[in-house]
């Protein structure tokens, strides 16, 4: 479309019509409205105006020229085989020259003119011009003021010089008058003459003093005036220089040290380095009268190629300086590398820098070296001096790393990692949420076989104890029971000594402890331990004296034994109620529950309900069909299905929630035990459980805990290995019994591993290669093959593929469901690994009465058995004058001509000794044998 008016032309230029009208008026084209016609001359006039505004010559004169230079050279280079080959090298250089306008030297070169210019740009330029004009006006006014002050100072100086001259003339005339005055001695006028003379002398002194003062003042004024005049003159000269200087000129900084010339702009190849002699005589850019530097004045220096001169002469295969511009060939045909022959001016610091190094809980050698700004090899050297062999990826614990940092002369600080768990502390308080009464959590504790589970059985009216393997509890069970007085949550703990940690967890999570003591058995070791756990947790005790229906029950003895353990009954002034019960007949059960609820009322147990749930992992296991399953006791808040929970390093969304009877529920309040599914892994029993706001935060904290646990464990293992390295070298070789333990729940695994590791001695050690929750899989069998371990399954079984693999590789898999049996069998196996004890038993004493030398046989001794018996093949000691001369064994034993096995006391015999002939008459032989006796743990 032809643009023949202002509006159409503005549309074509994609700019507002009123802005285009303003630009047309500035260009001298008078157009008043957008409908006015535009001719080609008007458009050309506008274009010329815009070009001038942008610093482009209107006649289209070229102000920039680009020169391109291409140069091809050849170099000869030896390849990997030693043959010489020619390489073509092409160097392309490009240089651009810009012609600047001489009339406006202060303006910097501008870019090509834009097709249009907006109002904001015009206003900005006008404002800049106005500021420049104001600055020049101020500078001129300052200059005029300084010049006037200079003229005034010069006038004052002339006046002072004139006054000084007049004073000198007056003094000279006075002296001349005194010299020319005649001396007349008249007797009658002597008195008058004397008066005149005194007056003249006084006037002369006054005149001299006045002249001196005037001269001094004049000289001081002259010095001050001269200094002021010089200061004003210097200031005027500076202002003039500033006004005459080009406004936008940038002074090039003087180089602090000689450096190589900058490569030409646009070149595709690095220019050659200059020789040391040429650096001093380097040409400077020519400077014109208006102080404008011309870059083209030193163009020839840019194009110099000194590499040719440097490389001239006979080329040899050993010439390492071959090639252009410092490029050198790599050895044996490898890629060439560039070597800069210029010397660096950098000087290394003379003083050692002491750094503050913040050391986290775990750190690798490489990271520690980076923090200290040293090479990793230096850190490894210092570690070797400290007796530790390691690599750069080795993880060091905090203590070792801090010792190393101090050893290397730096300051070590124990630093905390960026702990995302700090975010958990923000949402812990529920001060604004009302706390409501909750049911008490009661833990039943006591010695094994004292009837804890049977007591709970009767309370729950269920048969649990009969289902336990061996009739003993090996898991911690959680149940809640509705009574007429309210709900009570019970935790049943094992009584066996192996389950110490499990009982401690039960005491930690509980409000009240029921201590079950058998009336016929009294206080036993685990009873004492349960009392200690309850006291450590600060939990009130209710003592249930069980089995009162048995004939051998003695309640008074039980009370006395408990008083000895600082558990005093209420009837004796203590604070622990004693209740006699019978789990078999149900006698005293109601009284026991009454006492429990009474204690709960005194404690005033409360917890927030409408809040995110928090609780404790009571037990955890890996179910083949359901995955990780955790039994949780909710302590506060309400746990709902679908909540995101975090338990130690395990996290996940609650997919299903079951009560202790296996029924599905949707939510659980305080003091309710539930079984949840959906966690990423089996959590450790005793871990705290909390509901998180979102899954991302739970995942972040869980992964952080996993990494932290792994790093700390690895660092501790490494430290333990290094500590025990030299100790083990000094002792004999310790025998290991490697084991892989798989259990049904986390608590059983913990108890079994602890019990087996307690069996370790200085000679035989139980090495638990791997311990986990769940069934025995193929990976467990493969691990057993690699580590030559025995697999123990506690209440678990191996699947079909694992059984086949174990049979094929001869891996021993043992199944147990009672912890006693597992511990006893492992103890027996370890006893078999012990080195047998050697005992020496004396058999008899033989006297040598005759020695017969036979050339082919050696010395034959004719002997008489004094006591005991002499057996063929037994060990003997040769005694000469009751001193042991030799220890060995009998080679042959004969009676007459027949070989015999033994000769008893009172009989004669002939014998030879193995590899020994130095026997004499009268020597005695002590016959003995060494017996090996099996040892037990």
Curated annotation (Swiss-Prot):
Family: Belongs to the TRAFAC class translation factor GTPase superfamily. Classic translation factor GTPase family. IF-2 subfamily.
Protein's name according to its UniProt entry: Translation initiation factor IF-2
InterPro entries: DNA-bd_dom_put_sf, EF-G-like_DII, EFTu-like_2, IF2_assoc_dom_bac, IF2_II, IF2_N, P-loop_NTPase, Small_GTP-bd
Function of the molecule: One of the essential components for the initiation of protein synthesis. Protects formylmethionyl-tRNA from spontaneous hydrolysis and promotes its binding to the 30S ribosomal subunits. Also involved in the hydrolysis of GTP during the formation of the 70S ribosomal complex.
Any one GO molecular function term: GTPase activity
Organism for this UniProt entry: Janthinobacterium sp. (strain Marseille)
Binding site for GTP: 446-453, 492-496, 546-549
Keywords: Cytoplasm, GTP-binding, Initiation factor, Nucleotide-binding, Protein biosynthesis
Renumbered residue ranges of the record's region G5: 582-584
Keyword DNA-binding: no
Domain tr-type G: 437-606
Bias kind Polar residues: ranges: 295-304
Positions of region (G2): 471-475
């Amino acid at each position: 479309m032809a643009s023949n008016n202002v509006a159409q032309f503005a549309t074509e230029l994609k700019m507002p019509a009123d802005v285009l009208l303003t630009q047309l008026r500035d260009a001298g084209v008078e157009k008043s409205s957008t409908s006015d016609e535009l001719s080609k001359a008007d458009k050309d006039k506008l274009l010329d105006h815009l070009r001038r505004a942008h610093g482009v010559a209107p006649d289209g004169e070229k102000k920039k020229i680009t020169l391109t230079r291409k140069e091809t050279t050849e170099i000869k280079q030896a390849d990997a085989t030693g043959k010489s080959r020619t390489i073509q090298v092409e160097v392309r250089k490009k240089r651009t020259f810009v012609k600047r306008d001489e009339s406006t030297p202060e303006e910097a070169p501008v870019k090509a003119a834009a097709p249009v210019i907006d109002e904001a740009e015009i206003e900005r330029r006008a404002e800049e011009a106005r500021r420049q004009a104001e600055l020049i006006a101020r500078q001129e006014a300052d200059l005029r003021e300084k010049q006037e002050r200079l003229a005034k100072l010069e006038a004052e100086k002339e006046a002072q010089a004139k006054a000084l001259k007049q004073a000198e003339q007056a003094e000279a005339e006075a002296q001349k008058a005194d010299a020319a005055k005649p001396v007349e001695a008249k007797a009658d006028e002597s008195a008058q003459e004397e008066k005149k003379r005194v007056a003249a002398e006084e006037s002369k002194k006054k005149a001299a003093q006045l002249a001196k003062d005037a001269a001094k003042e004049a000289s001081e004024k002259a010095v001050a005036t001269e200094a002021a005049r010089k200061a004003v003159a210097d200031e005027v000269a500076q202002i003039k220089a500033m006004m005459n200087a080009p406004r936008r000129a940038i002074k090039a900084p003087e180089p602090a040290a000689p450096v190589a010339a900058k490569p030409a702009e646009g070149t595709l190849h690095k220019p050659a380095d200059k020789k040391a002699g040429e650096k001093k005589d380097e040409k400077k850019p020519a400077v014109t009268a208006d102080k404008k530097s011309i870059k083209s004045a030193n163009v020839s220096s840019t194009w110099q190629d000194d590499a040719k001169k440097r490389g001239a002469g006979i080329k040899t295969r050993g010439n390492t300086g071959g090639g252009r511009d410092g490029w050198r060939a790599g050895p044996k045909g490898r890629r060439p590398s560039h070597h800069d022959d210029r010397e660096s001016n950098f000087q290394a610091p003379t003083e050692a820098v002491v750094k503050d190094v913040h050391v986290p809980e775990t750190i690798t050698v490489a990271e520690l070296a980076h923090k200290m700004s040293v090479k990793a090899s230096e850190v490894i050297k210092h570690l070797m001096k400290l007796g530790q062999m390691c690599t750069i990826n080795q993880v060091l614990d905090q203590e070792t790393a801090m010792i190393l940092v101090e050893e290397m002369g730096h300051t070590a600080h124990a630093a905390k990692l960026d702990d995302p768990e700090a975010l958990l502390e923000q949402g812990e308080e529920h001060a604004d949420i009302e706390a409501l009464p909750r049911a008490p959590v009661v833990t039943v504790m006591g010695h094994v076989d004292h009837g804890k589970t049977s007591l709970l059985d009767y309370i729950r009216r269920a048969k649990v104890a009969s289902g336990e393997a061996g009739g003993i509890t090996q898991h911690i069970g959680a149940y809640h029971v509705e009574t007429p007085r309210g709900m009570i949550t019970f935790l049943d703990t094992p009584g066996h000594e192996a389950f110490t940690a499990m009982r401690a967890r039960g005491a930690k999570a509980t409000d009240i402890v029921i201590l079950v003591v058998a009336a016929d058995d009294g206080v036993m070791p685990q009873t004492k331990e349960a009392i200690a756990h309850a006291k450590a947790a600060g939990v009130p005790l209710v003592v249930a004296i069980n089995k009162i229906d048995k004939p051998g029950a003695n309640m008074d003895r039980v009370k006395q034994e408990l008083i000895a353990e600082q558990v005093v009954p209420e009837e004796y002034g203590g604070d622990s109620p004693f209740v006699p019960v019978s789990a078999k007949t149900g006698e005293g059960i109601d009284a026991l529950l009454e006492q429990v609820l009474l204690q709960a009322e005194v404690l005033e147990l409360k917890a927030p309900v409408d809040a995110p749930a928090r609780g404790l992992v009571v037990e955890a296991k890996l179910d083949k069909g359901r995955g990780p399953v955790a039994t949780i006791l909710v302590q506060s808040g309400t746990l709902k299905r679908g909540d995101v929970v975090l338990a130690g390093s395990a996290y996940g969304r609650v997919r299903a929630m079951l009560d202790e009877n296996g029924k599905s529920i949707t939510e659980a309040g305080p003091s309710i035990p539930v079984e949840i599914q959906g966690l990423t892994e089996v959590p450790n029993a005793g871990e705290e459980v909390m509901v998180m706001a979102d899954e991302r935060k739970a995942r972040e904290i869980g992964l952080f805990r996993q990494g932290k646990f792994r790093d700390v464990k690895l660092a501790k293992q490494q430290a333990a290995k290094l500590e025990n390295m030299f100790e083990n070298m000094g002792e004999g070789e310790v025998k290991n019994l490697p084991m892989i333990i798989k259990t049904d729940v986390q608590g059983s695994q913990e108890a079994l591993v602890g019990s087996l590791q307690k069996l370790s001695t200085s000679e035989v050690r139980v090495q638990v290669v791997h311990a986990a929750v769940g069934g025995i899989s193929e990976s467990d069998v493969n691990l057993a093959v690699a580590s030559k371990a025995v697999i123990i399954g506690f209440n678990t079984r191996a699947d079909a593929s694992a059984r086949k693999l174990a049979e094929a590789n001869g891996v021993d898999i043992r199944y147990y469901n009672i912890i006693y049996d597992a511990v006893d069998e492992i103890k027996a196996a370890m006893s078999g690994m012990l080195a047998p004890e050697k005992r020496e038993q004396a058999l008899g004493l033989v006297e040598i009465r005759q020695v017969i030398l036979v050339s082919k046989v050696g010395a034959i001794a004719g002997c008489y058995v004094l006591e005991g018996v002499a057996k063929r093949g037994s060990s003997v000691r040769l005694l000469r004058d009751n001193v042991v001369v030799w220890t060995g064994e009998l080679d042959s034993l004969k009676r007459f001509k027949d070989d015999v096995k033994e000769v008893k006391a009172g009989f004669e015999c002939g014998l030879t000794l193995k590899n020994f002939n130095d026997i004499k008459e009268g020597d005695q032989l002590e016959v003995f044998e060494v017996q090996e006796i099996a040892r037990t743990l």
